[in-house]
């Protein structure tokens, strides 16, 4: 009966998930901060093991609005990061994610829709749909993570948080006209149009 209602049980985690929303960003003109936020999770290698880093990114400014570093890949970390971003910055028009189990979990979907926000999801395996976050992951890893060998989760969490603060406030981006994400967040920049 769950399949008939658009609900499936995720076989990997046992988390009840939602019917997948469609991708809403195709040909969307993104011309202001707080219009579209993207969430994604990546793994960060440590000296022994790894942690998961989930971030909320404003697509217009590339600013990382909130993040969570955790030892498990659960919906609660995405929910908490999104709740922190909404509390600090208001709500966007659209939240875009991939189809990871933490984002298809009913808990996360309810959080997004409960704020009156539209939920958009990339096509399965379509990394280009979330290219802004993928670029940020590359930057975080090459400029910080790969230069470290984190001993503890606490050390990773603290160091990544320091880097994200620097990334937002001091690191200029060529794609942002040499401005930092913070400068664009505050002052705006020319309109971005996503490719078809």
Regions found by a protein language model. Give the residues of each.
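Active-site beta-loop-alpha junctions of metal-dependent nucleic acid enzymes
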Residues: 49, 67-89, 94, 101-104
């Amino acid at each position: 009966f769950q399949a008939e209602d658009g609900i499936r049980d995720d076989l990997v985690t046992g988390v009840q998930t939602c019917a997948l929303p469609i991708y809403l960003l195709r040909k969307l003109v993104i011309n202001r901060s707080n219009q579209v936020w993207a969430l994604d999770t990546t793994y960060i290698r440590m000296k022994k093991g790894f942690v998961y880093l989930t971030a909320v990114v404003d697509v217009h400014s590339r600013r990382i609005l909130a993040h969570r570093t955790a030892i498990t890949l659960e919906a609660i970390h995405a929910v908490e990061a999104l709740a922190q971003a909404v509390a600090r910055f208001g709500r966007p028009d659209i939240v875009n994610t991939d189809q990871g189990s933490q984002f298809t979990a009913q808990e996360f979907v309810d959080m997004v829709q409960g704020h009156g926000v539209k939920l958009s999801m990339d096509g399965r395996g379509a990394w280009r749909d979330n290219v802004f976050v993928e670029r940020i992951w590359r930057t975080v890893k090459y400029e910080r993570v790969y230069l470290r060998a984190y001993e503890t989760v606490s050390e990773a969490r603290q160091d990544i948080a320091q880097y994200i603060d620097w990334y937002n406030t001091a690191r200029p981006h060529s794609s942002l006209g040499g401005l930092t994400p913070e400068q664009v967040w505050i002052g705006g920049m020319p309109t971005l149009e996503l490719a078809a």
